[in-house]
Every structure is written in structure tokens, then in C-alpha cells.
Amino acid sequence: MYIAGVMSGTSLDGIDVALVRIEGSGVESKVELIHFTTVPFCNDIKSEIQQALSIENSNVQLICSLNFKLGLCFANAVKEVCKEANFSLEQLDLIGSHGQTIYHQPKQDGNRIPSTLQIGEPAVIAYETNTTVISNFRTMDMAAGGQGAPLVPYSEVILYRDPSKNRLLQNIGGISNVTVIPNQQSDQNVIAFDTGPGNMIIDEVCQRLFQLPYDQNGEIAKQGRVVNEILTYCMSHQFLKMNPPKSTGREQFGEKFVSELLKRFEKHSKENILTTVTMFTANSIVHHYKKFILPYYEIDEVILGGGGSYNSTLVEMLRNGLKDENCAIFIQEDIGYSSEAKEAIAFAILANETHHCNPSNVPSATGAKQSVVLGNITFPPV
């Protein structure tokens, strides 16, 4: 089957689309990446997404309209990946669309029950591409008592499980998440959870203090020094004290967190602030490894993915934090994969599993009561 996996993450970099060929299903799946592209959001759409993400500035009319606008954006992104690959849209069998997360509440808060909302209307995508769309992957896991995240562990087991090596798959997107993949001979469980911020705080600080979208290659962070009082403040965040399974998002580490941090530590240089929040991302990852993973699993390799794996300052901080743990650290490209395409490929795989009526959540990762088939299916017009 030819499947397009579509992902728009918490970093708001744009729409990632992976055109993938998949044979079979489950652990026997054979997955080939044909082409990958990122279609940037136009400024107007990005601004509307940012407004929709803000509890103070959002409204239902905006979200309703944006749902359909993003559906059109996602459809156009699918057309673009096919065009770049010289691949006929008529040959496409399926689209797996994650959507744009507007709000994610993994746990009960007063009378607000666990819930999640991703938008990007699948009917618009199906109509515009004349292709069946599978979307809304997180809700069935939450209906089964899970947190709806992380969902990539299923695909990571298919792609990265090794005959003899125990691996950690560390994604550093807007939020960071880790998947523990025991080797094929092991009887230990696959576990996965969010480790905290990825690029989210770094990018927000860059935009506010340097008027730059992100710290390219970590060049600015390389110039500053870590301020211990800022790092201690960040590392005291309640999320780091919670036990897995757990998930987080912009609600905990977005604009509100950064506003409070910059107000509290405004006396420090902007370079030092950026260096310190970069160290916070690294330290929060290392903290979770040492507390929840390394005491129970012997890890041979750590494989980094997502946009944060291109931040050499962040990667070096991670290497220093793990230098005594006797595990090799790679990025996706070192082992023949793409850091950028990883999550879009994951949702192509999840769409394939839903098409075959296979459960594809990992209850040991999300906390769900059982394995469930994920996603809603939207057929194109007859």
C-alpha cells in the first residue's frame, strides 16, 4: 500500500508529510520511505494556530474555521509530496493524518475529564485528495483509559527492534518523548513516556529574545553559560516528579511557562537564558533515564530523532549527561533513517494498522486498559 503520513507537531514548524510504501502489517511490516517533505505554514495560518492554542485569546469560531482551513492545508501538503516524488495522487491508497493538537489534557482536573483535541478536518482532506483518510488517532486510547500519548512506540518497535541490542528511541520535537525497545530475545516490556520539553521552550525563548524562529545548530546556546538558579527552577517542575506513564504539552511548557521564567530571571543575559533552557531539555531527558529506565534496563544505544537532534549544543549536553552510562548515542541519520520524517512515517504505519483492523496503541506506554484500534476512517466521495 502507498500511504501518506501527515504530521503537524507542537513546534509549529510546518506540515511534515512522508510518502511511504508498506507491505503487510504488524511486526512483519516492510516499510519504505519514498519521499519526505515539510510544507511551511503561511504566516496567517501559523498566527491563527498560535491564537487557537491560547486559552486567553482563543474562541470557538476561530477553532471551527481553522479546523477546515487546516484540512485544506493538509490536503495540499499531500499533493505537494506526491508532486515532488513524481508520484500520481491516484495511486495513493491511504492518508494517516495526526492533525494539529489544540489542547491535550491527559489527566482529570477538577470536573474536566481527560480529553484531547486535534483539528484538520479529515472530510476536507478526503474530498480534496479523493483518498481515504484515517485521523483522530489519540481518542480511542483515551477512551480506554490511556493518556492518548505517546503513540509512536508501536511504529518504533516495527522499525527499530534489534536482535540483540536494547535501544532507547528519543524524539526531541516540541515535546520530548522516549521509547524503550528491548531486544528481540528479551521478555521485558516496551515502555514509553514524555520526558518534558524538547524544542518548545528553546524556540519560544529564541523568538522573544532574539527574534529568531529557533537556535540553528545550537549556535547561540554555545555562546552562553548555564545559570544554576534558572536550571534549578526549571528542574523543580512538577512534571519531572511524576511517574510514567505520563504525557505533557504546551499547557505545561508553552508561552505561560516562558513568560514566568523570563519575568523571574530578567536580570540575566539572553544568551545565558537560552543556554540554560537548552540544558533544561537535556537534563530533563537524562533525569528520566536515570530514574525510570537505567535501573531496570541495560541500554546499548540511544537513537535521537526530531528537530532537536540537529541542535549540536543540545546533543553535546546529552552526551555529557550520559557519559558514565556506557551507551552509544546516535542520531537517526547515523543508522540510515531521517530525524525529520520519523513522526510522519509513524502515522503512516498507524494508518496501515487501522486499515488492517489491528490495535496499535501500547498500553504499557499510554496507560490504557487494553490494546485498541486507533483512529476514525473518513471515506472519499463516491
Swiss-Prot record:
Root EC class: transferase
InterPro entries reported in the protein's UniProt record: Anhydro_N_Ac-Mur_kinase, ATPase_NBD
Residues the record lists as binding ATP: G9, T10, S11, L12, D13, G14, I15, D16
Nucleotide-binding keyword on record: yes
Signal peptide limits: none
Enumerate the catalysed reactions.
1,6-anhydro-N-acetyl-beta-muramate + ATP + H2O = N-acetyl-D-muramate 6-phosphate + ADP + H(+)
Which pathway, metabolic or otherwise, does it act in?
A: Amino-sugar metabolism; 1,6-anhydro-N-acetylmuramate degradation; Cell wall biogenesis; peptidoglycan recycling
BP GO annotations: 1,6-anhydro-N-acetyl-beta-muramic acid catabolic process; amino sugar metabolic process; peptidoglycan turnover
Q: Give the top-rank taxon of the lineage listed in the UniProt record for this protein.
A: Bacteria
Show the SUPFAM superfamilies listed in the entry: Actin-like ATPase domain
Molecular function (GO) terms for this protein are: ATP binding; kinase activity; phosphotransferase activity, alcohol group as acceptor
Q: What is its EC number?
A: 2.7.1.170
Transferase as UniProt keyword: yes
| Any Pfam family hit | AnmK
Entry keyword set: ATP-binding, Carbohydrate metabolism, Kinase, Nucleotide-binding, Transferase
Q: What does this protein do?
A: Catalyzes the specific phosphorylation of 1,6-anhydro-N-acetylmuramic acid (anhMurNAc) with the simultaneous cleavage of the 1,6-anhydro ring, generating MurNAc-6-P. Is required for the utilization of anhMurNAc either imported from the medium or derived from its own cell wall murein, and thus plays a role in cell wall recycling.
* UniProt similarity note: Belongs to the anhydro-N-acetylmuramic acid kinase family.
Protein name, UniProt field: Anhydro-N-acetylmuramic acid kinase
Q: Which organism is it from?
A: Bacillus cereus (strain 03BB102)
